[in-house]
Amino acid sequence: MASGGSPVWALVALLSLLPLVARGERAVGAPEEVPVSNPGVQEAARFALEAYNRASNSMFCYKPVRVLKAETQVVSGMQYYLTVEIVNTRCEKKVGCGLKNMGSENCAVPSEAEQKQICEFVVWSRPWMQDTRLSSISCTPSSS
């Protein structure tokens, strides 16, 4: 017997989602905007910037200016989608780029405000496995 009914079931499944879309509701598991002050967001931003500093070719550390936007998505763990404004400092990487070192005068921000960048980070956290990963980085110079 031919299985010609499968396209019909796909259409029925798709049509069943229309009421959710029409009301503006999000599908279960879709990314959801959260306050930038959320502790999980702040921890993910800290992790992302430390990973960015390790990976960058700059001799100096970057530090966060502010988290501009944050979304979370429940996956196998929590995925954080972050838009963060960062700035280059005068703090040399050999001193360390941890937040405790960022307050010193050596980590002052150069007067050239062109050092700012807007970065999109995706951080995947699975706390029960003590596993946090930076899945994606994309930075562009800030226009402000």
UniProtKB/Swiss-Prot annotation:
Q: Which range is the signal sequence, renumbered to this chain?
A: 1-26
Where does motif Secondary area of contact map?
A: 73-77
Note the SS bond partners: 91-107, 119-139
User: Would you identify the family this protein belongs to, as annotated?
Assistant: Belongs to the cystatin family.
**Could you tell me the superkingdom of the organism this chain comes from?**
Eukaryota
Reactive site (site feature) positions = 29
What is the name listed in the Swiss-Prot or TrEMBL entry for this protein?
Answer: Cystatin-POGU1
GO MF term (any one): cysteine-type endopeptidase inhibitor activity
Q: Does the keyword Disulfide bond apply?
A: yes
Q: Does the keyword Nucleus apply?
A: no
Role noted for this protein: Inhibits various C1 cysteine proteases including cathepsin L, papain and cathepsin B. This protein has no toxic activity and its function in the venom is unknown. It may play a role as a housekeeping or regulatory protein.
* Classification via PANTHER family: CYSTATIN-M
**Pfam families, per the entry:** Cystatin
Q: Which SUPFAM superfamilies match?
A: Cystatin/monellin
Q: Where in the cell is it found?
A: Secreted
Keyword tags: Disulfide bond, Protease inhibitor, Secreted, Signal, Thiol protease inhibitor
What InterPro entries does UniProt report for this protein, alphabetically? Answer: Cystatin_dom, Cystatin_sf
Q: Where are the transmembrane segments?
A: none
Q: For the Cystatin domain, which residue ranges apply? A: 29-128
Instruction: Give the source species.
Output: Pogona barbata (Bearded dragon)
Could you name the Gene Ontology cellular component terms for this entry?
extracellular exosome
